[in-house]
C-alpha cells in the first residue's frame, strides 16, 4: 500500500482496539466505502479512465469456484458466474473468479484472456494477488466477517477456502460443545456465527484471524486507493465511522 499509516490502520481494524489515525494518512491514500458493487466498479473504472491502468477487483473466499472447470484463458459464454450479487435498481452484478491456470493471466492480463481485454472482468483471490500491488483496488467484502454491536464475528458457512476446512470444523465443534454444556443457547444445525474475540472460544478466534488476515492482504494491495463494497449494512456503517474518525 502507498501509506505505512494506512497499513497500520488496517492491522488494527480487525481488532478490539482499532487505531484512530485516519487523519495521518487520508491525504496520502484514498479509501471509499460504497453501498453497491456497481458503485465500486464505477469508481475503479473512473480511475482507469484517468490513466491509472493497474486496477483490479478482489474478494475473500466467500464464493465457490463454479467456473474452475473452465481452464481456457477465455471463460465459456455459458459458464456459471462465481459472483452473482444483488445490485441497485433490482439489477445483478456478476463476475468470475480469476482463472486458475496461473498468476500471470490475472496479475498481468497475459495472453488472449478476459483480463487482457478488461482488467476488471475477473475477481482476484488473496492467493493470486499476494505480493503484487496495483494502483487502485476494488474490494468485495461479503458475508464472511462482520460487526455486531461493535464486536467482530466470523461466519463458518460463508467461507469456501479449502485450507480453512479444519479450522471451520474446530470452530463448529467448539460451539456444539458449548451448546451441549449449556454455556450458550442455540441449535446444532444453526451454528454459523462465531465471535472473533471471546476467550471461551479459541478455535473461533483462530478462524477469525485467518479470515481477517486474508482481508489485510486484500486491503493492502493498492498503491493509491481502495474502494470497498461492504454487503452488511452494520459493518459498512462501522467502517465508515472509523474512516470519519468517530
Predicted segments — roles?
Residues 2-153, 205-208:
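Conserved helicase/translocase motor-coupling segment
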Residues 115-246:
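C-terminal accessory regions
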Amino acid at each position: 500500500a502507498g501509506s505505512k499509516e494506512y497499513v497500520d490502520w488496517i492491522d488494527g481494524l480487525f481488532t478490539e482496539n482499532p487505531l484512530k489515525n485516519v487523519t495521518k494518512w487520508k491525504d496520502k491514500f484514498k479509501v471509499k466505502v460504497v453501498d453497491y458493487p456497481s458503485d465500486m466498479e464505477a469508481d475503479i473504472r473512473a480511475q482507469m479512465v484517468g490513466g491509472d491502468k493497474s486496477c483490479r477487483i478482489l474478494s475473500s473466499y466467500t464464493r465457490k469456484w463454479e467456473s474452475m472447470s473452465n481452464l481456457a484463458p477465455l471463460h465459456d459464454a455459458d459458464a456459471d458466474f462465481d459472483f452473482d450479487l444483488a445490485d441497485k435498481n433490482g439489477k445483478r452484478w456478476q463476475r468470475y473468479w480469476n482463472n486458475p491456470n496461473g498468476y500471470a493471466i490475472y496479475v498481468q492480463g497475459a495472453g488472449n484472456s478476459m483480463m487482457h481485454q478488461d482488467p476488471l472482468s475477473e475477481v482476484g483471490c488473496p492467493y493470486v494477488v499476494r505480493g503484487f500491488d496495483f494502483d487502485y483496488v476494488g474490494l468485495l467484502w461479503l458475508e464472511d466477517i462482520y460487526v455486531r454491536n461493535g464486536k467482530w464475528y466470523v461466519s463458518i458457512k460463508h467461507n469456501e477456502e479449502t485450507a480453512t476446512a479444519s479450522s471451520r470444523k474446530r470452530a463448529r465443534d467448539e460451539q456444539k460443545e458449548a451448546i451441549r454444556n449449556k454455556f450458550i443457547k442455540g441449535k446444532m444445525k444453526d451454528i454459523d456465527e462465531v465471535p472473533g474475540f471471546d476467550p471461551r472460544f479459541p478455535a473461533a478466534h483462530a478462524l477469525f484471524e485467518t479470515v481477517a488476515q486474508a482481508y489485510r492482504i486484500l486491503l493492502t494491495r493498492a498503491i493509491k486507493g481502495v474502494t470497498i463494497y461492504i454487503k452488511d449494512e452494520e459493518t459498512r456503517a462501522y467502517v465508515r465511522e472509523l474512516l470519519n474518525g468517530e
